[in-house]
């Protein structure tokens, strides 16, 4: 299991939102690169970054902050937000991003995902953010009529590296992961699934390490790390002890 620390970027700063609402943003660090280094120093091995402004604009908006992080940390970085065409995918991978996350475009333009996954094997993930079971797009500003499972199944044979499944209702609220829905998705498809939204404490990490969650690739931790509710050393030691 991989525990991904999250850095969400808004106006070049490291923030956390509540339920994806840009008006409910809390700034946690003015220097995202310093935050990335802190996570690396704490022992994390894979960083999760989202360009929030990019998700709304439909194009990269925090490139300077992302590039500054890439210069400082050597661990793999997966990036989402504003990645809507093959040119942007290629540009980010060329700059050192390990894995890009395609969200809105996976709903609007599934062929883009298939082309990108074929062109860059193992380096394209799909972000599915659900509200009441239906996938939200455009930075969560709009809700579609399709379910996460419907979309995930489109990419079963496309070579997608992972599905990142976020429960919007829990995101940033420390209510605990929606493991039931995440595990159900993971059990229904062959693509590895990453849990996101609501991770609140070491209890969520323990739940991720139980046999029923064995198919999940990992979980994303955000506010719990920034608020000090989740101790990085304790969480990483537990993961190493149980999953190796």
Swiss-Prot record:
Matches recorded under PANTHER family: 1-(5-PHOSPHORIBOSYL)-5-[(5-PHOSPHORIBOSYLAMINO)METHYLIDENEAMINO] IMIDAZOLE-4-CARBOXAMIDE ISOMERASE (PTHR43090:SF2)
The family this protein is said to belong to: Belongs to the HisA/HisF family.
Asked whether the keyword Ribonucleoprotein is assigned, the reply is no
Subcellular location(s) of the protein: Cytoplasm
Q: Name one GO biological process term.
A: L-tryptophan biosynthetic process
EC numbers on record: 5.3.1.16
What top-tier enzyme class does this entry carry? isomerase
At the top level of its lineage, which domain of life is listed? Bacteria
Q: Provide this UniProt record's keywords sorted from A to Z.
A: Amino-acid biosynthesis, Cytoplasm, Histidine biosynthesis, Isomerase
Reaction catalyzed = 1-(5-phospho-beta-D-ribosyl)-5-[(5-phospho-beta-D-ribosylamino)methylideneamino]imidazole-4-carboxamide = 5-[(5-phospho-1-deoxy-D-ribulos-1-ylimino)methylamino]-1-(5-phospho-beta-D-ribosyl)imidazole-4-carboxamide
Its recorded name reads 1-(5-phosphoribosyl)-5-[(5-phosphoribosylamino)methylideneamino] imidazole-4-carboxamide isomerase
Q: State which pathway it belongs to.
A: Amino-acid biosynthesis; L-histidine biosynthesis; L-histidine from 5-phospho-alpha-D-ribose 1-diphosphate: step 4/9
Q: Where is the active site?
A: 8, 129
Q: Which InterPro entries match?
A: Aldolase_TIM, His_biosynth, HisA_bact_arch, Isoase_HisA-like, Isoase_HisA-like_bact, RibuloseP-bd_barrel
Source species, please? Answer: Bradyrhizobium sp. (strain ORS 278)
| Presence of keyword ATP-binding | no
Q: Which GO terms describe its cellular component?
A: cytoplasm
The molecular function GO annotations come to: 1-(5-phosphoribosyl)-5-[(5-phosphoribosylamino)methylideneamino]imidazole-4-carboxamide isomerase activity
A Pfam match is: His_biosynth
């Amino acid at each position: 299991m991989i525990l991904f620390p999250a850095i969400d970027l808004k106006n070049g700063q490291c923030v956390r939102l509540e339920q994806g609402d840009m008006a409910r943003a809390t700034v946690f660090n003015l220097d995202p690169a310093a935050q990335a280094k802190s996570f690396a120093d704490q022992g994390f091995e894979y960083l999760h970054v989202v360009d929030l402004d990019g998700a709304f604009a439909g194009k990269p908006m925090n490139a300077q902050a992302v590039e500054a992080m890439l210069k400082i940390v050597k661990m793999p970085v997966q990036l989402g937000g504003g990645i809507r065409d093959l040119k942007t995918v290629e540009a980010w991978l060329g700059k050192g991003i390990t894995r890009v996350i395609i969200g809105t475009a996976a709903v609007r333009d599934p062929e883009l995902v298939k082309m990108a996954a074929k062109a860059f094997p193992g380096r394209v993930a799909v972000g599915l953010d659900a509200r009441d079971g239906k996938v939200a797009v455009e930075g969560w500003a709009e809700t579609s009529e399709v379910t996460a499972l419907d979309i995930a199944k489109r990419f079963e044979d496309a070579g997608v590296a992972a599905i990142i499944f976020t429960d919007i209702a829990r995101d940033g609220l420390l209510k605990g992961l929606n493991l039931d829905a995440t595990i159900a998705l993971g059990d229904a498809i062959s693509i590895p699934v990453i849990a996101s939204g609501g991770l609140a404490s070491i209890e969520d990490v323990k739940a991720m390490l139980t046999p029923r969650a064995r198919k999940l690739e990992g979980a994303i931790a955000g506010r719990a790390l920034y608020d000090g509710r989740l101790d990085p050393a304790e969480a990483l030691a537990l993961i190493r002890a149980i999953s190796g």
